[in-house]
Amino acid sequence: MSSEQSAPGASPRAPRPGTQKSSGAVTKKGERAAKEKPATVLPPVGEEEPKSPEEYQCSGVLETDFAELCTRWGYTDFPKVVNRPRPHPPFVPSASLSEKATLDDPRLSGSCSLNSLESKYVFFRPTIQVELEQEDSKSVKEIYIRGWKVEERILGVFSKCLPPLTQLQAINLWKVGLTDKTLTTFIELLPLCSSTLRKVSLEGNPLPEQSYHKLMALDSTIAHLSLRNNNIDDRGAQLLGQALSTLHSCNRTLVSLNLGFNHIGDEGAGYIADGLRLNRSLLWLSLAHNRIQDKGALKLAEVLRAFELTHTEVVERRRLLLEKGTQERSRSPSSSRHGDSKTDREKSQMVGISNSALVDKTDKTQTMKTPKGLGKKKEKSWELAKKEEKLGSGQSPTQGTPKKEDATKAGKGKVTIPEQKPSRAKGIKIGSREKRSILLESELVVEATEVVNPLLEPVEHRDGKVFMPGNKVLLHLNLIRNRITEVGLEGFLATVQYQMQFSKAKSASKGPVGLLWLSLAKNCFAPQCPAYAIIQELMLPRDPIKAKLREDEAMAFFP
């Protein structure tokens, strides 16, 4: 027992607590040292610090620039830039080929591999599809983004990589989840792009505030705008109509506007018609698949024929006429000075020619006459020259008078392009430097007066009211699948008949002739409706596409 009791005391395991204390002290010192001296982690060899996207200089290759900028923005997974697939021509295999494929192709009987499944689902991955002008990666012509959300940061990437694309013509965004904020950012991006960008398509992007009219601002360069399937209602149509034209402003760049597959009703159609009253740039308008009934159809038809000006429009017309008169009166002294300078130069040339002719005549008659007669001839020639010089400071009987008449006519009458063409042709024939400079000045005046306010167009006064000829610039109007009945058809029939008479009267002179294509099919009337049949008959010879087809058929039958 004593040995058993003394054993624990003599056991070598007794000093363990001491050793534990010493080891604990060591560990605490190590932890303290680790806290005091943090370990320095060296970056791997070849890895650089992340670069900011502002420092990157774009190369003009969209695929490279977009990938690099997305990486610098912190994107790990981003859409790829691919060529837009083109539809292949339909291929109909023969019976022998189809039998051989069923016998020889093992893929038809076996299960699909993992690679084939991945290749199938690659189609649904977000991509940026591009069309190239040539087989050059720098010649991107159109951009298509379809079915994935475009965020604010992606638009920031586009603001860097799209401006270097010098041949970009169109941007198409289909169901990309735009908001009013991202639309504003997108609109701010457009002026940075190339001047060749004229077409924008925003389809399937409904916005709560319906701020699509911002794309049609006065400083916008968009010529073709498509806003299909955006749930645009009458409130959005009001904003679009005001963007087309108001009493004091007008969009002069938009050529085509597609508002199909929206929720525009009679009230919205009336707002669009109000925008067409003073707009003289829109050639193509589609309101297909909307909710327009007879009231809205009649408003659209009314603006395309002679319509009555409102009181505010009449007042604005008078103000514009007064301004035009004061401008012409202020221009008339400068134009007369130009005319006088022209006649002075021409008369000085005529004086030189007459003097040389007189000298030649005196040389010829020197041997025929006595010195006294020669002296008399010389005196007479100098008197004639002095008289012509005096006339040169005033008016020339041959050239000065018609020039002054032209100047007074130009000051009194309306300045138009056809009236300026003869003067330009005369200036080109003369060919002197001074006349070329005057010609350039006249061209600048013509360009400034090219865009005439529609309120200054010729009007007709009837029963104390002022009537404008109507919008003859719109060539294409699509109203398929609305809710128009025979009542609305009568309004369009009157419009077509009026435009036919107007075009016959204007056949000799060039200018807008009115609608060339009008589509009213699949509305709330029978196809055999008499008014619809008459409209179709009247519009058939005006349709340029069908007229071209008839010409081709005639050439085929009678080569």
From Swiss-Prot:
InterPro entries listed in its UniProt record: Leu-rich_rpt (IPR001611), LRR-containing_protein_71 (IPR053040), LRR_dom_sf (IPR032675)
Start-end of Basic and acidic residues biased regions: 28-38, 324-348, 380-391
UniProt biased composition (Low complexity): 1-18
Region listing for Disordered, in residue ranges: 1-56, 324-427
Keywords: Leucine-rich repeat, Repeat
LRR repeat residue numbers: 172-193, 196-216, 221-241, 253-266, 281-302
Name of the protein in question: Leucine-rich repeat-containing protein 71
Organism: Homo sapiens (Human)
